[in-house]
Every structure is written in C-alpha cells, then in structure tokens.
Amino acid sequence: MAVIRRRPITPSISDHSIPGPSAGQRRPQQKLWRRSRLLLFLFFSASLFWLYNIASSVFENLPSLASRDTQRFNEGFTKIRLSDLELDIPPGYVIGHADFGDGRSRTCKKEFVQPQSEGCNWVNVNLGNGGSEPNLSGGMIPSVAPPFGMTRWTPQTRENYVSMCPYNQTDTKIHGFIGTHQPAIWMGESGPVEIHASLGEVITDFEKRGLTFKREDEYASPNYYRNLLDVGKDIGDVEIEMSATSRVGHIRYTFDPSSESIKPHVVLQTSRKTWILHGDQPDDKVPYYPNGYIEVDLEKQEVRGWNDERQDHVLVGDELPAKNFKSYFVARFSQPFSEGGISHAGKIQPNVLRGQGKVLAGYVQFPENTKEVEVRVGVSFISLEQASRNIDLEIPSSQSLAQTPQSTRSQWADKLDLLSVEGAAPSNLTVLYTSFAHTLVYPYEMSEPTPQGSMYYSGYLDKVVSGISYSGYSIWDTFRAQSAWLILVAPERVGGMIQSIIQDYKEGGWLPMWKNVVETNIMVGSHADSLIAQAMKVGVKGFDYQEAWQAVRKNAFTPPDRDTELRFADREEGTPQEVRAGLTEYKKLGYVADDLHSESGSRTLDYAYDDHAAAIVADIMGATEDAALLRERSKNYKYLYNNQTGHMEARNSDGSWAGQEKGWTEGDHWAYTLDVMHDVPGLIDLMGGESNFVDFLDRHFERGHNLHTNEPSHHIPYMYILASAPHRTQEWVRRIGESDYNHTADGLSGNEDCGQMSAWYLFSAMGLYPVDPANATYVLGAPFFDKLTLTLPSTGKNVEIKAKGASSGMKYVKNLQIDGVDHEDVVVPHDVLEKGGVWEWEMRGDHQVWGM
C-alpha cells in the first residue's frame, strides 16, 4: 500500500451540526438559508465522494491506531468515517511508512519523516527479514544508521551469531536495542553493545528481560524506530524510540509505570555468552565467552565499557589474531541517576560500579516519577575517549531526538532521491527503493574523526593508524554489480573504499576476499582485482594506482603460504590468508586440481576472470608483458570444458575428470559452465556456436538450475542476448524480477549478500547489467517501468530511461535510441551511461528482432 505524506485529516461534515434559522427570521432569509444549505450539502457531498475515492484507493484495510496509543498520546483523535472505513490519526501524525509487507499501516510523528523524501517513504526495512532458514532469508534487519554507517542499531528479538540475525519479524518480544557490526547473516558479530530499559526489578538475562509488543505498535524506517513494550499488567509500559548516526545511537525511553513507586532502569550489556560456528552448518556452533569491561560513573553520569567479541576470530586466527581488538562504548543520560550496579554471570551486584569478565552488564536506576530518559551511546574501535568524542561530534547534548532522525533521513534522501520512477505499482516502488537502500549499507566505515585526523583500528597491524578504512567487504558477491552501482550513485565513496583495500594489502600482505575487521578466507577468488580494474577503467580518483597494481600483481603471481599443503576448505580454521589457493598448480596446469584443493572448479573459473581483471590493470599501468600473459591465462576456463558432457568439470592433478558434482561454490556444473563473464564469444565457440549455446541456456533455465539465490547465476539471463536471442534475456530477467523479489518481509529469495541481490534488481529495472564489471561495460536487457530517471551525483546529469508500456507488461524491445540516435549494440560502455541523456526504448508485447 502506498506511503502517505499528508497532514492529519480534518473532521468530516458528519461530525458537526449545521444550525437552522432562529425563531422570528423572515421567510426570504429562511428560503435563502435553505438554498445555501442545499448548495452546502451538494458541495460537501461531492467533496465526500471525492475523498472517499481517494481514501479507498490509498487507505484500504488500514487499521486504526491501538487504543492504548490514544491514551498515551492523550491528544484526541480526528476521525473520518467513510463507508466501512475508519482511519484514526492523532494530530501531528502522518502515515509515515504504510507497508511492512504484513498488511498493517504505521503512523509516525511528522517530525520523524522530515525532510520530505519520496525515496525514503518507500523503504521497507523489514524486506528480506523473512524466511524460516538462514539461506531462505535475505538476512536483513530493520536497522537504523546513515548510509555506510559504522554501527547499525536495531531492536533485538534474538541473539545473533553466524547464521542468525538479531531481529526476526516473527518474534513477539524485544530484549533491547543492539548496536551491531554483523555484516551478513553468514558472518560473525564484532564488538556489539546492547541496551535495554524496563520498570521495577532489574533483569539482565537475555531471555528473561524480553518484553512483549504488538506488531501494530511498531514503526521502523532507515532513520527512526519506535515501539511500545509491555512490562506487565501490574508494572506498566515503556515506549522505546531510537535513531542513530554512524557512530552514535540516540535512544529515548518513555516510562509509564502502573504505580509511582516503581522505578525505571537502563541496562547496558557489554559481554555475553555467544556462539562460534565450527563448520558450515547452523548446528555446528559452540559456546563462546568474550571478555568485557563495564564502569558505572555516578559522578559523570555515564556508563562506559568495552568487549573483545569477534565471532570470526577462529578463521584466520594464527596469522591475524587482532589480539587488541576492542569495541568501546560510552552511554550518556539526559536524566540523573543515583543508583547503579553490575551483573556478572547473571548475578545482580547493587552498588558495585565496575567489573571485568564474561557475561557482564551494568545498570542504572532512576528516581520514581522519572517519565522520560534519553540515552546517547557512542561507539568506537579506537578508545573510550574516542567513543565519547564521537558523541560530542555527532549527537551533542543540545541535539533533540527529532533532529537526529532528520539528519539521518537527510543522508538517505540525498541518495534515494537520485532515483525517480513513473508507472510503477506501489509494491514495485517498495522493492525498488528498498533495494537502493540495501546497496548503501556495506562496506561500513571503520575510520573515525580524531584530533589527529581520520584514524582507525587496523586488525592486521593490531593497532590504531591514520587513514580511511572500511569493513564488511563481501567481494565475491558485490564485485558483480553492487560495486558498479556505487560508482554511479556514491562516487565520492568509491576512491576511499578502494584505498581501504589497498591499506589492507599494505598492512596484511594481501587484498581482502571477505573482510570482517580482518580477512576471513570466506569464498574464493581474488575479486578485489575486479574492483580495482573497474575503478581504474572509469577513472576513479582517491587511491594509489601504483600500489593497487602491486597488490593485484601479487594476487596473480604469488601463491599463498602453504599452498601445496592445505586444501583451504570452506571455513577451515587457522589457515593463512587464502587469496588464490591452488595458484601453484593453476600456473603449472592451467587449472586448480580438485584432489589438492577444495572448490577447485569454481577457483579455476574465478581465477580466469581475475586474470582478465588483472590484465586490464596491467594495461592501464603500462605493464604490457604482464598484461599479455594474464590475458592468455584468462582463457584457462577452457581446461575445464568436457566435450563429452558439454559441461564444465573440475579436474584432478593427473588430468582426469573429478566428476560433475565436485568442486563448485554456491552453484552446480550447469551454472558454472556459464561462468565465463569476460569471454562470452569464446565460450559460445567452445560450446559449438550460438544455436547450441542458446539450447544449453534453455535447458539450464527450464530444468531449474538457475538459482538466483546464488550469485554465479546473476549474469546468466543476460547471456542470451550475447548469443543473438535478446527476447529470452528480456523474458527471463523480467520473470526473475517478479519471482525472486517482492515488497514483503519475504521479499528476497536468498541472502542479500551486502547489496548484490538488490543491485541486480536495480540495474535490471533500468534495462542493463554489468556482466563483465572489470571492463566497465553493461549488457542491455529491457526496463521494468515506463520511466526511470537516475541523477548521477558525479556530474549532476540525468539518465532518463523511457520505455512506454513496460509497466503494463511489455517486455520486448523493438528499438532503442540514445539521445535520438538508434543504438544497435547490445553492450554499452560506462562512459555512455555516465554522459547522461535520454534512452528511449520502444517496447512491444511480442518479441522483436532488435539485438539479434
């Protein structure tokens, strides 16, 4: 249902009586009054009919606000009664976000939906939070932070660890807010902080402190969260509100005790019992007890602490221990407290004001009749002093809770409003703008503003250093499309993000694969090569090109330590940095041997692509001999093609075939046969020409091998058009866009993977996709909507995608004109897109010859 940005609806005429003529009035006046009354009646009847039609189309099935909210706000509601529809909105409130995918509306104070933003209004922060199993969920949470924020704050309904997020929309209790650094559902948490408020008895145990809520009381957006928690019938309620900046959470608690003698309190959990995954299944978890410190300062009216929780520390433990890693926090309160204590291993210790150890929390109690408390929680990876400084810089005491959501919303609006759409249904707008928001979360900021300039904790050096740093790099996923999307919509960030991975190379010896504070060795390939090639190709500034080439060259020519000893299996613990595991035999044989290394088929194909990316970098840097060698090596994919089966297949070190089912990462031999994004003409020739290739694609799709939940499938529908079958690209891209994405909590068919799933949708909605991202080109598909306009912040120019009829189901392209000139090529270089202009697509309901 549509998001409505309206002022409170005024009372209808039925709520007021219209006075008749008083006694003794003359009949002409009475007649005039009757005529006037008739005119007024006709006018208001017409108005009511008009209002009914609008409301019926927009507000259908919206429930009224809960009755206890009426009591709490104590403001009186205006009401309009239209047929069977009742809509109650308190003065000063709007429908700030009306669609959570659960059929319920949400109201919000107007101050929290400012500034006006079409893009922000359509974001459903619960999209991607559904799914009964980790791999059936988008792994998203209703978090609050600005784009690329260091710490995301979210209500916590469950304890998070690898394979579990801290919030699930099926839960009925909230256990507090958590400031989280968990970048994806299959990655671990690093240094969280939890805060919880209640009435009466102080309870710190996670399960016992949970408070029930009603889903209709919940309001969530990228910049503000609100809910009403029930402490108990004889105890009272707590209204919780939360916003955040990059490094500071801003929380307000409004206490409504059933008795004046009941005191409110706030708990801050610094260390907890959590879990480490030893293996690749959720049941492979074992308990893990991080260390923590807590201090309740009655004089400064602060609570301070730190913990060293890193759930992924076992993956590259010996080489990159990051022994001094700590996440620090400082909490400041708007109201004075005179009592406090700690909880150690579940035991409450009143008046003990500091402690260190496992399963540790601190708490403060407020005097009776304390109705409202604001808390500012600064977070830092540098020090307690820096956590305090972050509060001063981002949310000083003079800043109200209304100002923080407005500031954060403004940052989201600056990005989301770059996109405008015409002809899209409300559900499509929710998918589109939520996808946009999902692409702007990772990687997240690690660097912090200090008196000495920008600094960050380096897990590689295990100390604080100067510079810019990001974490949460899921490069195996995001190199495919999310990186290209950020070049379009966040170019001011990209140079720093590339410099960050170069810093990782300088500090840790290698470019990252999957960085979560430090390298984790998750996934395969050295796809940072592609990020660098792409950035160089489009002319991104802000990073050292020479150092970047040195890093890429090392990836391409230097095997990792113990390369001939280890298999480097998925989530194998205590290994050195993996990078291109199996590079020793890849250089010798042309492929990674399956009897020597895990995931060998995927590695071989990924390394071939990475050689292609490295060759682009070498060309740009003038290293012609290296470029020629790498370009030749990029054809190593041919070593895996089995002419007898017509599929790619992993091989053993003696040259024998390993079997079709062995050696793959998040895919099968069908998907990986098509995993040659950089040389599609060569692959088509290898498979016997376009006709055979298209037949293989048909069987791949029709037999259910294209699992869009896994990234190796993302480019595959765009391969049809490269084999002169454009209509099949147009059909399958549209079908995937409709089947694997929707506006509900179950709106993602698989893990979001740090924005890659959403980047696919955004590009596809525009009618193009970066099949070969390192080369900075786009393969054309067909737009989803009648008109889509993207403003490019680097130039201020607009790319107008016009495709009349696309919104009503026309998916076939008859012709494309760019700025009035016919465009026949199905591949478009980045510089054409960067120039802006009008892309006029002529759409039809049956397939055409364009693109053949």
Identify the role of each PLM range:
Residues 1-35, 66-80:
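Short, low-complexity, Lys/Arg-enriched N-terminal segments of secretory-pathway carbohydrate enzymes
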Residues 21, 31-38, 55, 66-68, ...:
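Mature N-terminal, pre-catalytic/accessory segment of carbohydrate-active enzymes
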Residues 39-53:
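Hydrophobic membrane-insertion alpha-helices, especially the h-region
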Residues 49-70, 79:
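Membrane-interface motif at the C-terminal end of an N-terminal transmembrane signal
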Residues 86-483, 487-530, 536-605, 617-636, ...:
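Accessory carbohydrate-recognition regions in carbohydrate-active enzymes
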Residues 610:
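ATP-dependent phospho-/nucleotidyl transfer catalytic cores
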